[in-house]
């Protein structure tokens, strides 16, 4: 039977291939018993984080580590979204909120993470073995997760830096505007702000968008 020492070495070898992160299930499968895990955590050699384990323990985890932790904890059907997914795809925003999408009817709980559960289609990008929401979807998930003032600032920044155009926005939000959808009211308000900024073309696009979503109480050019 393999010794605990060699099992620990194998876990640490696996962690190097997974951006410093291993799941508790992986640790158990390799053969490290719970008592040894507790000892390694208590001595600071390993560190518990987001329901998984950081190996070796570090004070901070980079975006790729966060994404790995979320994927291992939430399963292969989940998507890493929000600011983490944006930064990993080259869009540099400062917010450190952790956001992930999980399919219905799964109901995981994970402290410190905004979990989105819906049946909306999202584009998927695979980067370094991880499933990330494509930039436009990660941006929309961020917009509905942060505070209202932050969402306005983020949208302004995205348009100014040409991370997306007004047309990109309208194309992406139409499936999210149905009544009862998470964040739909906020997305409608932000769509109005874009329409007002782009004048008649934007207002016409916005009107079509709202009609398609069954929203009939909006009036263009209303003052």
Features from the language model and the residues they span:
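Short gly/ser-rich loop at a beta-strand->alpha-helix junction or flexible surface loop bordering the NTP-binding
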Residues: 1-185, 201-202, 207-209, 219
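Conserved adenosyl
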Residues: 212
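Short, intrinsically disordered, charge-balanced linker/junction segments flanking boundaries
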Residues: 216-223
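A short, surface-exposed helix-loop junction/capping segment
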Residues: 182-194
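A short, highly charged nucleic-acid-interacting micro-segment common to nuclease
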Residues: 191-205
């Amino acid at each position: 039977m393999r010794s605990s020492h060699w099992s620990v070495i194998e876990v640490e070898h696996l962690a190097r291939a997974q951006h410093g992160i291993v799941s508790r299930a992986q640790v158990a499968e390799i053969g490290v018993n719970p008592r040894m895990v507790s000892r390694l955590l208590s001595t600071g050699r390993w560190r518990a984080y987001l329901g998984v384990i950081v190996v070796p323990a570090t004070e901070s985890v980079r975006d790729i580590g966060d994404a790995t932790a979320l994927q291992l904890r939430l399963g292969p059907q989940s998507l890493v979204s929000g600011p983490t997914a944006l930064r990993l795809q080259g869009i540099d925003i400062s917010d450190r909120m952790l956001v992930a999408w999980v399919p219905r009817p799964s109901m995981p709980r994970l402290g410190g993470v905004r979990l989105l559960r819906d049946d909306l289609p999202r584009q998927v990008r695979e980067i370094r073995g991880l499933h990330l929401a494509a930039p436009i979807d990660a941006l929309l998930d961020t917009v509905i997760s942060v505070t209202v003032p932050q969402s306005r600032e983020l949208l302004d920044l995205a348009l100014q830096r040409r991370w997306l155009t007004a047309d990109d926005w309208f194309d992406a939000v139409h499936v999210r505007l149905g009544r009862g959808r998470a964040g739909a009211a906020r997305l409608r308000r932000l769509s109005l702000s874009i329409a007002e900024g782009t004048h008649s073309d934007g207002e016409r696009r916005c009107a079509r968008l709202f009609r398609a979503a069954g929203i009939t109480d909006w009036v263009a050019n209303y003052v």
